[in-house]
């Protein structure tokens, strides 16, 4: 695990007594080959290329898995741009693939914004989505968490071989990983005050023409979701089933965010042992460029620090390209770099 942000300023001589450690393979082959994985999260600071990396990973996984789903939980919903295809809140097949599906959700909108396909007739839909939103608004964070819970229930029911999450920036990502705890805490609070809010719930049900329903019945309905939540929570903390891939660029602020994310993942007991360093500049000796050389020098400094701090991680180095990675064909081409280290012009 990382030594901590403070270690970035340590002079090189302080590492002289440390034994040499053989660097781990600089690819995501370990992820592709670990067939027990069911949940793969890709995240990091905004603007570092998370979506391109997560879509590329999903493409590579689709070549060896029966069915793959990539979910965007980022309100920006860039996977539609990456594949040049419009996706919705329901899993849709990616053009050109028989076993790769994509969907985009915005958990911050809450349960009431999810489509009817997410709700079983005898469960949340029968209570009315608007009432659910009103009831949940009393518990900070639980509406978003319940939205995650319903998505997980849907996804688990479809039995995808593996699910890749293209996550929002760090704060949203940590809420996603903590949603089981938030839901359980919210339900506990609901049980404490159920007698006080029972008239409100009954009134809402009558207004919606749903008949009488008291707080006990609402709590019972919500508790039906708990087995799924607890199952997912256990899987998230199992390194055989879940891992997190950090994406960053070789700059101080991005590395700082990556270190903070890794520390938070450790607190959540979420496995992480892969870092993608994106947008690296590799000067071409045949086409001198002072700015490129200066940029390369700065990036090399942070790369050296990363290799000292994260010696137990697979560090994948990806180049800054002169074009956008947009469309299924370009994503497929770029995805090869996840399995084969990039060779800059000077090394060819």
Curated annotation (Swiss-Prot):
It catalyses: ATP + H2O = ADP + phosphate + H(+). It comes from the Eukaryota. This is ATPase GET3. Expressed in the epithelial cells of the liver, kidney, and stomach wall, in the adrenal medulla, in the islet cells of the pancreas, in the red pulp of the spleen, and in cardiac and skeletal muscle. One of its GO terms (molecular function) is metal ion binding. It is an enzyme of class 3 (hydrolase). Changing residue 46 to R: Abolishes ATPase activity, dominantly inhibits the TA protein insertion pathway. The gene is GET3. SUPFAM superfamilies: P-loop containing nucleoside triphosphate hydrolases. Its EC number is 3.6.4.-. It is linked to Cardiomyopathy, dilated, 2H: A form of dilated cardiomyopathy, a disorder characterized by ventricular dilation and impaired systolic function, resulting in congestive heart failure and arrhythmia. Patients are at risk of premature death. CMD2H is an autosomal recessive form characterized by rapid progression and death in early infancy. The keyword Nucleotide-binding applies. ATP binds at residues 45-46, 49-52, 251, 278, 319, 321. The active site is at 74. The modification N-acetylalanine is found at residue 2. Keywords: Acetylation, ATP-binding, Cardiomyopathy, Cytoplasm, Disease variant, Endoplasmic reticulum, Hydrolase, Metal-binding, Nucleotide-binding, Nucleus, Transport, Zinc. It is found in: Cytoplasm; Endoplasmic reticulum; Nucleus, Nucleolus. Belongs to the arsA ATPase family. Zn(2+) binds at residues 289, 292. GO terms for cellular component: cytoplasm; endoplasmic reticulum membrane; extracellular exosome; GET complex; nucleolus; nucleoplasm. Coiled coil: none annotated. HAMAP family: Asna1_Get3. Homodimer. Component of the Golgi to ER traffic (GET) complex, which is composed of GET1/WRB, CAMLG/GET2 and GET3/TRC40. Within the complex, CAMLG and GET1 form a heterotetramer which is stabilized by phosphatidylinositol binding and which binds to the GET3 homodimer. Interacts with CAMLG (via N-terminus). GET3 shows a higher affinity for CAMLG than for GET1. Interacts with SERP1 and SEC61B. Interacts with GET4. ATPase required for the post-translational delivery of tail-anchored (TA) proteins to the endoplasmic reticulum. Recognizes and selectively binds the transmembrane domain of TA proteins in the cytosol. This complex then targets to the endoplasmic reticulum by membrane-bound receptors GET1/WRB and CAMLG/GET2, where the tail-anchored protein is released for insertion. This process is regulated by ATP binding and hydrolysis. ATP binding drives the homodimer towards the closed dimer state, facilitating recognition of newly synthesized TA membrane proteins. GO terms for biological process: protein insertion into ER membrane; tail-anchored membrane protein insertion into ER membrane.
């Amino acid at each position: 695990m990382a030594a901590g942000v403070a270690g970035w300023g340590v002079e090189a001589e302080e590492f002289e007594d440390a034994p040499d450690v053989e660097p781990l393979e600089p690819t995501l082959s370990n992820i592709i080959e670990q067939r027990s994985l069911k949940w793969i999260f890709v995240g990091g600071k905004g603007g570092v290329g998370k979506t391109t990396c997560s879509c590329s990973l999903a493409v590579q996984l689709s070549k060896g898995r029966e069915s793959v789903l990539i979910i965007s939980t980022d309100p920006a919903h860039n996977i539609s741009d990456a594949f040049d295809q419009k996706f919705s809140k329901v899993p849709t097949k990616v053009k050109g693939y028989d076993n790769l599906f994509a969907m985009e959700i915005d958990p911050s909108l809450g349960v009431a914004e999810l489509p009817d396909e997410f709700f079983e007739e005898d469960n949340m839909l029968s209570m009315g989505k608007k009432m659910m939103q009103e009831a949940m608004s009393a518990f900070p964070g639980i509406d978003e968490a319940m939205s995650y819970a319903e998505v997980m229930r849907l996804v688990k029911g479809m039995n995808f071989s593996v699910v890749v999450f293209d996550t929002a920036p760090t704060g949203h990502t940590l809420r996603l990983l903590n949603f089981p705890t938030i839901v359980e805490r919210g339900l506990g609070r609901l049980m404490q005050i159920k007698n006080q809010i029972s008239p409100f719930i009954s009134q809402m049900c009558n207004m919606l023409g749903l008949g009488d329903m008291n707080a006990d019945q609402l709590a019972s309905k919500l508790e039906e979701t708990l087995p799924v939540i607890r199952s997912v929570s256990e899987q998230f903390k199992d390194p055989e089933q879940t891992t997190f891939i950090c994406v960053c660029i070789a700059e101080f602020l991005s590395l700082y965010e990556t270190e903070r994310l890794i520390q938070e993942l450790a607190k959540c007991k979420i496995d992480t042992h892969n870092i993608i360093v994106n947008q690296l500049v590799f000067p071409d000796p045949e086409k001198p460029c002072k700015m490129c050389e200066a940029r390369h020098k700065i990036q090399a400094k942070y790369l050296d620090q990363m290799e000292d701090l994260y010696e137990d991680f697979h560090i994948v180095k990806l180049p800054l390209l002169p074009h956008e990675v947009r469309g299924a064909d370009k994503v497929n081409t770029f995805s090869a770099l996840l399995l084969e280290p990039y060779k800059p012009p000077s090394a060819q």
